[in-house]
Amino acid sequence: MNKEERAKRQSKIRNFSIIAHIDHGKSTLADRILEKTNALTQREMKAQLLDSMDLERERGITIKLNAVQLNYKAKDGEEYILHLIDTPGHVDFTYEVSRSLAACEGAILVVDAAQGIEAQTLANVYLALDNNLEILPVINKIDLPSADPERVRQEVEDVIGLDASEAVLASAKAGIGIEEILEQIVEKVPAPAGDSEEPLQCMIFDSLYDPYRGVIAYIRVVNGTVKVGDKVRMMATGKEFEVTEVGVFTPKTTQRDELTVGDVGFLAASIKNVGDTRVGDTITHAKRPAAEALPGYRKLNPMVFCGLYPIDSARYNDLRDALEKLELNDSALEFEPETSQALGFGFRCGFLGLLHMEIIQERIEREFKIDLITTAPSVIYKVYLTNGEDVIVDNPSNMPDPQSIDRVEEPFVKASIMVPNDYVGAVMEICQGKRGTFIDMQYLDETRVTLTYEIPLSEIVYDFFDQLKSNTKGYASFDYELIGYKPSKLVKMDILLNNEQVDALSFIVHRDSAYDRGKVIVEKLKELIPRQQFEVPIQATIGNKVVARSTIKAMRKNVLAKCYGGDISRKRKLLDKQKEGKKRMKSVGSVEVPQEAFMAVLKMDDN
């Protein structure tokens, strides 16, 4: 293509993504847009088409972002090229959203006509505003009996401050309003800025590993043009490669000769090493490099850590490969090797949140067929010692000796919870039970309230979200951000089985609730650990002090079965002999801890 053709094509490109709270109909809307632009034949169409991972389809959530190029003939008779970048809506995957938005000029904000604005919608809108996107509100699910589009329209204006007078009323399921949405995209979303003659700058917003083609980078071209055969350089790592193919997704990968300004597509350059392409990096030409890299994304720090161990320790290296491949297209995952006396070799992994942790675990078990044991999730604590040093602890078993600790600080988050006002009491009760401090309460309209609390991250990390949902019948929505560290009275609790400490069961707990937690966990372990041939004491200790204890009684066979009648001293002899044997067994016996027992440490707040 020559310069004029490229410029004409550029003016017809529209890059947009769809943002919404979980379950407001984002993936269905994407399906309808694909149908309307005839991207697929009727036969290829299936629900949630862009959610390509099995896990996404099963859980009905979007985890990874996805990109697709569509051709649309607008009412003005012109052909437009639309790039739709689908994004997740769940709080753990905000990072994926921020990456999608950085590659767009516009965003469709989908709001459920019955439920209105929720916490996650707001968080994503602010991300879109940070990236200076044109936001087009769409009120979805207007065919629901409980829909109230006018109230929601008012809410969009009041809460977000967007002009919603031209908001499209749509129903993705019934296919209403799809054409209006496409027309608005063409009309209101600006064409990509940038110059096809400038030195090349492409932003990598995702990547995938293909065993045959190496690493495939998903890119958005900001300036310049990239063709097959070009020598390109990654600006962050300085590595150079020759481009073997470029192309676009029409959901399927379709090869092209070149990608130019505004294009969203993929680039393969037989990159074999996973570490050479970093998401957020800029690709430029080796011969004529760009003066500076594009502003990447802020690197996300993991909030939650846990140990992952292969059940079969021979598969340790397979687990490392699996984690490296997942890290490639999930740049928020971090991991490093660790060992545990109870579980052998494994990895300490950092995640953005619990859903993220669960998804990674399931992906390893499914995609790589490795059975895992996970330890209790924990957060990063800062421990200040009496000798003036400070240590960072992300694994409870590394906690220093209590005598040498001056104070411990833990991370706090500011949680905003949107909830119908019938449930305010229930939510406040949960937050107080989680050591939350009440900050603020605001009414959005007559029926909904936003509560703001400061809560320790370690309290949210396990089942806060589940409790919130179950106590508000699923109506509460919740978003949190880290605000920093504050001192807390924290102690480390160890669990001893048969007088031996099991390092993988240790956890850090607030001193006030230590006694109760200890009692609950000891009872729970008593139910879960199978009975042995000898008696097993279970103890919960803080330092050298035992705070709770329980005993698993021994299984024993009836040694008196053969004595019919007979003398008492004969029976006594047999019983004493059995006791002696059990004692010997106890001194050498070791106790197998099942995976359920590790999970029990986590699910302690069930009662």
From Swiss-Prot:
UniProt KW Ubl conjugation keyword: no
Reactions that this protein is recorded to catalyse: GTP + H2O = GDP + phosphate + H(+)
EC number: 3.6.5.n1
Membrane-protein topology: Peripheral membrane protein
Compartment(s): Cell membrane
GO cellular component: plasma membrane
KW Cell membrane (keyword) present: yes
Gene3D superfamilies tied to this protein: 3.30.70.240, Elongation factor 4, C-terminal domain, Elongation Factor G (Translational Gtpase), domain 3, P-loop containing nucleotide triphosphate hydrolases, Translation factors
GO molecular function: GTP binding; GTPase activity; ribosome binding; translation elongation factor activity
Record-annotated tr-type G domain positions: 11-193
Residue positions binding GTP: D23, H24, G25, K26, S27, T28, N140, K141, I142, D143
InterPro entries (UniProt xref): EF-4 (IPR006297), EFG_III/V (IPR035647), EFG_V-like (IPR000640), EFTu-like_2 (IPR004161), G_TR_CS (IPR031157), LepA_C_sf (IPR038363), LepA_CTD (IPR013842), LepA_IV (IPR035654)
Source organism, top-level taxon: Bacteria
Pfam families the record matches: EFG_C, GTP_EFTU, GTP_EFTU_D2, LepA_C
SUPFAM superfamilies per UniProt: EF-G C-terminal domain-like, P-loop containing nucleoside triphosphate hydrolases
A Gene Ontology biological process term: positive regulation of translation
This protein's UniProt keywords: Cell membrane, GTP-binding, Hydrolase, Membrane, Nucleotide-binding, Protein biosynthesis
NCBIfam families linked: lepA, small_GTP
Function: Required for accurate and efficient protein synthesis under certain stress conditions. May act as a fidelity factor of the translation reaction, by catalyzing a one-codon backward translocation of tRNAs on improperly translocated ribosomes. Back-translocation proceeds from a post-translocation (POST) complex to a pre-translocation (PRE) complex, thus giving elongation factor G a second chance to translocate the tRNAs correctly. Binds to ribosomes in a GTP-dependent manner.
Protein family membership: Belongs to the TRAFAC class translation factor GTPase superfamily. Classic translation factor GTPase family. LepA subfamily.
Full protein name: Elongation factor 4
UniProt source species: Bacillus cereus (strain G9842)
Gene name tied to this protein: lepA
